[in-house]
């Protein structure tokens, strides 16, 4: 049995957990406070979902003293019923099922709590500067640390860690799909350019600058998906592939999904703790994979970024952006599954020696038929610096 914790904020953590669960051979249980549709669970006889109580709201919601235990943890509000029940469910599940490894995606408190049961823990490391005391603690207790970005983005040793970081590539729910199956940008002669504006569920209000960009461009078909009060579709794959340009925030799952579609992208990073999305956007810009706009940029700069990206997309004669290859989406879920299996079997040192291709997971980059782009690795996405 392999245990997986998926954070409830946004949809990306659950999507990543489901993708990796599908790539594993063992029984898997995903523990989360998020709502997971029954039809989203791969192989329900092997993969199960356990609902965790929320640790926010209700009594002891953080208004009381010391919700961070003196800065040593991120969120442990005193006398909070939900937190107590949450950690009790986690400990009881571990005691009952004795998982061979537990993957935390991602919570310092869950990481430490699982490790305190004597269970080997693997944790996801997110981009940004993560050298505060809670991250130092969490990084140090893990048997392995994984990152959902490519090797070209860098693999620094996270602050507090005793083991190297393993970048597995962008884990996307769309990794098995072919973005070239339908008409690609530049192949639809006579049609108006198509711009897709994605607004996710991870937070952030409506940025009215994009309304002005839409009005300024005028000559394009502008489609908006997601966001508070917006139109949602369960599967945006066709829209991703039909768009000449996609405008998106810089969340890890968002970028992985865009990479799977080999989309031409304008990235507008949202403000997140530890500079997470800013770090990802900076790496995309450094690798020449996206136009990046800032939160304070005027409308004319946003218009210019979209127009430049449209020009590249429309002149590409149907070729993708190259994001899929460079972001190493193909086989990423299998590579992360390989890390979990290696730790479960006590082969942590093999993970360190062999890097992303390990544990019998030779499908992946090789099986996809794609060769990774060789670029110097720099610690730009960086875990903690």
What residue ranges belong to the model's regions?
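A short, glycine/small-residue-rich beta-strand->loop->alpha-helix junction that serves as a flexible
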Residues: 4-18
């Amino acid at each position: 049995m392999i245990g997986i914790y998926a954070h409830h904020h946004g949809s990306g953590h659950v999507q990543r957990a489901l993708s990796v669960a599908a790539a594993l051979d063992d029984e898997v249980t995903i523990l989360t406070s998020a709502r997971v549709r029954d039809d989203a669970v791969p192989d329900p006889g092997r993969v199960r979902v356990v609902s965790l109580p929320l640790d926010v709201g209700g009594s002891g919601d953080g208004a009381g003293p010391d919700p961070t235990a003196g800065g040593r943890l991120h969120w442990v509000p005193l006398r909070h019923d939900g937190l107590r029940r949450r950690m009790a469910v986690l400990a009881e599940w571990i005691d009952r099922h004795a998982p061979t490894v537990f993957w935390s995606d991602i919570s310092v408190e869950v990481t430490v709590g699982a490790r305190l049961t004597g269970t080997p823990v693997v944790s996801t490391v997110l981009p940004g500067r993560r050298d505060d005391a809670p991250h130092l603690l969490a990084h140090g207790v893990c048997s392995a640390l994984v990152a959902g970005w490519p090797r070209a983005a860098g693999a620094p040793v996270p602050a507090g860690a005793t083991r190297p970081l393993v970048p597995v590539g962008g884990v996307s729910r769309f990794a098995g799909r072919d973005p070239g199956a339908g008409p690609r940008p530049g192949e639809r002669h006579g049609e108006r350019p198509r711009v897709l504006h994605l607004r996710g569920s991870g937070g952030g209000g409506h940025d009215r600058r994009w309304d002005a960009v839409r009005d300024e461009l005028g000559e394009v078909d502008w489609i908006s998906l997601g966001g508070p009060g917006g139109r949602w579709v369960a599967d945006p794959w066709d829209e991703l592939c039909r768009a000449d340009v996609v405008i998106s925030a810089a969340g890890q799952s968002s970028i992985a999904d865009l990479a799977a579609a080999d989309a031409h992208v304008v990235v507008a990073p949202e403000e997140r703790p530890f500079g997470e999305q800013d770090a990802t956007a900076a790496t995309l810009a450094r690798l020449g994979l996206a136009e990046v706009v800032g939160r304070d940029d005027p409308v004319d700069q946003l218009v210019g970024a979209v127009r430049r990206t449209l020009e590249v997309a429309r002149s590409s004669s149907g070729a993708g952006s190259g994001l899929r290859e460079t972001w190493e989406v193909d086989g990423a879920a299998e590579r992360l599954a390989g890390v979990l299996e290696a730790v479960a079997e006590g082969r942590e040192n093999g993970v360190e020696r062999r890097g992303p291709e390990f544990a019998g997971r030779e499908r992946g980059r090789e099986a996809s038929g794609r060769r990774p782009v060789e670029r110097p690795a720099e610690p730009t996405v960086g875990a903690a610096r």
